[in-house]
Amino acid sequence: MAELKNDRYLRALLKQPVDMTPVWMMRQAGRYLPEYKATRAQAGDFMSLCKNHELACEVTLQPLRRYELDAAILFSDILTVPDAMGLGLYFEAGEGPRFERPTDTIDAIKKLAVPDPEDDLGYVMKAVSTIRRELNGQVPLIGFSGSPWTLATYMVEGGSSKTFEKIKKMAYAEPAALHMLLDKLADSVTLYLNAQVANGAQSLMIFDSWGGALSHTAYREFSLRYMQKIVDGLTRFADGRQVPVTLFTKGGGLWLEAMAETGCDALGLDWTVDIADARRRVGHKVALQGNMDPSMLYAPIPRIEEEVAQILAGYGEGTGHVFNLGHGIHQHVDPEHAGAFIKAVHAQSKQYHK
C-alpha cells in the first residue's frame, strides 16, 4: 500500500498534533456535484452505482478532485447489510428505501443469517480495495456502517419512518425479539467493518442516524449497548497504524459521556450541540467531529466563513477536532460554497495549532 501523504485526519482523531484542523463532509460524494449526477445516470440507479466497484470508486474520488479534503469516505449505503440478509431492498421514487420482506416478527428475525462480508457483500469490499489503490496515499479512506438500532428501524418498519411506531412497539411489547435482531446486526456489522479494514479502510465510522428517536434509558438499552459490542470486536490496528473509530448518534447530544465510555476514539456531533460544551464534557477522552449545520452552506460565503470561525473558536486550541457538517451535505448546495467552506477551515484553523 502507498505511504499516506496526508494523515492529518487520522492524527486529529487520535489527538496527535496537526498543522491545521482536518475537514471532510458527510455525503461529500453526492448529488450536489454535477459529475456525481452524470455518473449516477450512467449507472442507472443508486444501488447499481453502489454495486459497481469502478463507479463507486469514481464517485468517491470526485470531491477530492475539486477540494482539498483530508479524507475520502467509501461510497455506499448503510442498507447494504440488511439487503445482504435477504430483505429485498428497493428504492421508491420520492419514498426512499423500502424492503420487500420486513423483519417485523420474531419468526422473520430467527430466519435471518449473518452475512459473510467477503461473499454476500463482496461488491463493497471490491469498492474499498479499488478506492484505497486509486487514492495512492493521497488521504485516508473511511469505512462505515449503520448502527444496529438504525438498521433495525428500516428492517422492522419496512423503510423510512417518521414515527418509528412498529419498532418502538417491538421494543416495548416484544423486547426479546428486538434484542435478538440487534444482536445479529451487531455481529453482522462487526464482521462487515473488519472486512472493510482488511480491504483497506483506515478509519471507521458508525452512523446511528435514528438513535435520537429513543428515550434516555431506551437509547442505552437498544442502541448504545450494541454499538459498544461492535467497538469491542473491531480491528483497531492495520498497516502499522491505529484504525480510529468514530460513533455518531444524530440527536445524541444528551449521551456524549456514555458514548465516550465505549472506547471509541471520536464522537460525531450534530449541529444542535455546542462544540465548546462537548469539549468540556468529553474532550479529555475522545476527539470530536463536526458540527456546522449543513443548511449553512446555502448562506453567502462570508456568512459561511463567519460560522467556521465561530465553531473553530468554540473548540479552541489544540488537536482533537475534525471539522465536518452536523449531517450530510444537501443536494441543492452550490459546489462553490462547499469549496469556500473547506478553504475557510484550513485557512482559519492554523492559528489554533501553533
From Swiss-Prot:
GO biological process, alphabetically ordered: protoporphyrinogen IX biosynthetic process from glutamate
Pathway noted in the entry: Porphyrin-containing compound metabolism; protoporphyrin-IX biosynthesis; coproporphyrinogen-III from 5-aminolevulinate: step 4/4
Major place of residence: cytoplasm
Catalysis: reaction(s): uroporphyrinogen III + 4 H(+) = coproporphyrinogen III + 4 CO2
Residue(s) at site: Transition state stabilizer: 77
Residues the record lists as binding substrate: 27-31, 77, 154, 209, 327
Superkingdom: Bacteria
Pfam families: URO-D
Keywords per UniProt: Cytoplasm, Decarboxylase, Lyase, Porphyrin biosynthesis
GO function terms (MF aspect): uroporphyrinogen decarboxylase activity
One of the record's GO cellular component terms: cytosol
EC number from the UniProt entry: 4.1.1.37
CDD domains: URO-D
Subcellular location: Cytoplasm
EC class name: lyase
Function text: Catalyzes the decarboxylation of four acetate groups of uroporphyrinogen-III to yield coproporphyrinogen-III.
PANTHER family for the chain: METHYLTETRAHYDROFOLATE:HOMOCYSTEINE METHYLTRANSFERASE RELATED, UROPORPHYRINOGEN DECARBOXYLASE
Subunit structure, interactors included: Homodimer.
Family recorded in the similarity comment: Belongs to the uroporphyrinogen decarboxylase family.
Protein name: Uroporphyrinogen decarboxylase
Organism: Shewanella sp. (strain ANA-3)
